[in-house]
Design a protein with these regions (language model features):
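Short acidic, S/G/P-rich loop/turn micro-motifs used as interaction or catalytic elements
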Residues: 36, 163-169, 229-232
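Walker A/P-loop NTP-binding active-site region of P-loop NTPases
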Residues: 20-93
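Charged helix-capping and loop-helix junction motifs
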Residues: 172-179, 236-242
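Pre-Walker A adenine-sensing motif
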Residues: 8-22
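Phosphate-binding/switch region of NTP-binding enzymes
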Residues: 189, 193-290
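NTP-binding/hydrolysis catalytic cores, primarily Walker-type P-loop NTPases
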Residues: 24, 131-135, 278-296
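Conserved inter-motif catalytic segment of the P-loop NTP-binding fold
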Residues: 61-166
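Conserved ATPase-coupling elements of RecA-like P-loop NTPase cores
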Residues: 165-176, 188
């Protein structure tokens, strides 16, 4: 299938708020506290790729403490989708990349079993140096995960598990995201292949050129956990220099709002560059099928 003019979020009512959906080649940040429904929204977006582009999106989990984000349980319950996980230590020979059965996977947990805190301030200089060596190895695996899916038709990705810190610049998760976004997701396919294959690039050059994809036709959704629980607090949150919110084309805020004597969930499209979008605060609920937007 051809890449659409807009990527559906998997929620028709939200697509309508966004003037038709998300813009290809851009970053969407979905921000809200733990448990508000970000992972479900991310899965709905990823699943929508099956109908729209012919391939579901992929999930890149950056949670560094405890288990992942329960993507497998959610995907099975919401869509009867059994996620195929790529393991962090799974070997990958150059010839494997072109084998769809070998490379096409749905989920990758980069910091699985690491148990690390997300702030660089928590690490001594020698610990940070040691951790960067380990990160480099994990990033090599990450290149294989993304490239190995993109050459087989995937056009959307969801990055989840980003934990809150006082300053985004102190978070090693944001260092990793910055690398992935600029050196994998927004880089010409043949140059990503060079980073992956290195000395084996020439031997694979013909296959690389026959599997080119346009990185401007990829859509990325970053699910960003906030300290703030209330939607009003998120609306007032300052954006610091280097914050991924400043670089995003689209920002969707999800939080709690007071409705009389009870709290309910609501979302707001705070930014949607280059497109008309609604200014409304829209209540929603989470069902077995995911997010459902409600009448105000």
């Amino acid at each position: 299938m051809t890449t659409p003019h807009r990527f559906s979020t998997g929620i028709p009512a939200l697509d309508e708020l966004l003037g038709g959906g998300l813009v290809p080649g851009t970053l969407t940040v979905v921000m809200g506290a733990t448990g508000i429904g970000k992972s479900q929204l991310g899965l709905q977006f990823a699943n929508a790729g099956q109908q729209q582009e012919g391939e579901r999106g992929i999930l890149f989990d950056m949670a560094s403490r405890g288990d992942g984000q329960n993507h497998g349980d959610y995907a099975k319950r919401m869509f009867e989708w059994l996620l195929k996980q790529r393991q962090i230590d799974e070997p990958c020979a150059p010839d494997d990349i072109w084998n769809r059965e070998r490379m096409r996977s749905d989920y990758f947990h980069i910091f699985e079993r690491s148990g690390r805190r997300v702030s660089i301030r928590d690490l001594e200089p020698d610990q940070w140096a040691e951790w960067r060596v380990e990160l480099n190895r994990k990033l090599d695996q990450s290149i294989a995960f993304f490239y190995g899916n993109f050459v087989h038709g995937v056009r959307r990705c969801v990055i989840d598990g980003v934990e809150p810190t006082d300053r985004a610049s102190d978070s090693f998760q944001f260092h990793v995201f910055d690398y992935i976004y600029h050196q994998i997701l927004h880089k010409d396919a043949d140059w990503v292949a060079r980073d992956l294959f290195r000395i084996h690039f020439r031997a694979n050059e013909e296959a690389v050129m026959s599997h080119l994809y346009d990185h401007q036709q990829l859509a990325t959704m970053l699910l960003y956990t906030s300290h703030e629980v209330l939607l009003d607090e998120l609306l007032c949150r300052p954006i610091e220099s280097g914050d991924e919110l400043a670089n995003a084309n689209t920002i969707i805020l999800m939080g709690k709002v007071r409705d009389g004597l009870k709290m309910r969930r609501a979302l707001h499209v705070a930014k949607h560059r280059g497109s008309a979008c609604s200014d409304e605060i829209i209540p929603f609920e989470i069902t077995e099928q995911g997010l459902t937007l409600l009448e105000g």
